[in-house]
Amino acid sequence: MSGFDVQPSRFGHVALLGRPNVGKSTLLNALIGADLSIVSPKPQTTRHRILGIATHEHAQIAFLDTPGLHEGGKRAMNRQLNRVARHAPDEADVLLHVIAAPRWTDEDEQVWKLIEQRDIPCLLVINKIDLVKDKSDLLPFVESISKHHAYQGIHYLQATRGKGLKALMNDVVRLLPEGQAVYAEDDLTDRSARFLAAEMIREQL
C-alpha cells in the first residue's frame, strides 16, 4: 500500500547473560513490568531459566533470565547453573550482555567468549551506572571495552529505577526478526503459578 508506513510485527527470544549479581533479574522485572524473577544480593539466586514476556503494539519479546556465569564452578550445583546459562543463547534471537559499572572482570570476559561463538546480535547493557559518581569515567571504560568487543549497541541503565529502559527496548525491537506473537497479550511468563509461588518464598529465605 503506497503512501503508508506499515510497521511489521516482530517476535523473538532475548537472552540476558552476565556474571552473578550484575542485575539481570532486576532488569527482567523492569522490562516486563512485574516481579517475576528473584532479586537478591546472594550470588546464584537465579537457578532456572526464567522466561518473561513483554507485549507491545508491534512486538512481543520473550526475555530469558539466566543464572550468572562464573568461574570456578566446581560444586555440582554451580556446574549445572553454568550449563543452564551456556545453553540460553541456543534459543535466542538477540543477546543482552549485562555488566555492572564500572568494572570489566574476568567473568565478564568469560561471558563475552560465549557470546562471540554465536552469530547472534548482542547489545552491551551497562547496569548500575548510579554507582559511578563521575559519569565522565564511563567514556574511557566503554572505549576500552569497544576496542576488543563488537557489540551492536551499548546502553547505560539504572534498572532499579527504570532509567534507560525505553532506549534499550527500542533497540531490542529493532533487532528482532519479523513474526507474529506466540503468547497471549496478557501473558507474563510460561512458568506455572506454583513455580512462581515457590520462587517468591525462596526470595525471602
What feature does the model see in each segment?
Residues 53-60, 80-154:
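Conserved C-terminal guanine-recognition region of P-loop GTPase G domains, centered on the G4
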